UniProtKB/Swiss-Prot annotation:
It is found in: Secreted. GO terms for cellular component: extracellular region. Belongs to the type-III AFP family. This is Ice-structuring protein RD2. PROSITE patterns: AFP_LIKE (PS50844).
Amino acid sequence: NKASVVANQLIPINTALTLIMMKAEVVTPMGIPAEDIPRIIGMQVNRAVPLGTTLMPDMVKNYE
């Protein structure tokens, strides 16, 4: 089971992601893989992401 990126806090809309906002957790359904954390630092979320929410590819601007 691979870990996904999960919000460690409420991330407001248009906020650039930092390491402290995220944690790796095994969740279902899977979201952005935890190994992509270095790649998504500095990318903005396109919606508010509540604490404990799995980050999905469509929540992060320019995540392919």
